[in-house]
């Protein structure tokens, strides 16, 4: 199985670390270099063409079936985009979180001591929703080990009890099918599976969900008519764009290149590719005597093997130590040779311990 875009990537290592950081495609690198050169020469400013923000907003909306650009706000990180959701909850409201949830999802709620935060195993999340639950916040795909949340089942549970659902799709967007009606609020960083930029993230909400929260400290970029309101703020837009923060335009150019490439290839094709590589790797690990987490995911985790990450890096295999385990992640630029190299390195690691 070959890379889905060999002309866009030329890593010098076996990069199996997309769950930490995606590799930028050549088109993104070229766009950023060109923008920097023009800026340094005084021919333009990074924000001279605001339509690039419209394009990236449209592109992200197309990743979620049923979403439109009016449902999308641009920001810089998951936690800050979740802050309005957390702040809108009344004192004593119950928030349900999964055990070992990534901290950018949990911290906006955990650090509001007036909320009643309850943490349960991921597999019991839907069963634990109850009438007093105000909100469930969860990642569609878990950062630590790649376990996949049953969003349809969880959505049914939240609807049955009148709870809201916030979903982080940072580890899912690009390879995992997403349906807008499966959550009230969506957040996503672009620098991992969207092969974008560290400084660009998205928030999505339908009007009825967005109307339950309000922007915290809106800036000039969130104005209904931003250039007309620079010195006399009048109104925020009726769309989810009112949650915009001023974007890093250089990051937007980088993220746009990644989104364009993902759309050209297609989520379905990327998902099939990633899952096939991950499944082959998972099967190989079992044959070597390891016990990886069994999940149909592009992330493969080996519990208790986190100490091997540094040894693998010395062999040019880039993975991550997370929550005591060793985490590998397979994306569109990986191929079967990467799987073979990683299995060889894991075999050598097995023999050395």
Tell where the protein language model's regions lie, with residue ranges.
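Pyridoxal 5′-phosphate
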Residues: 1-353
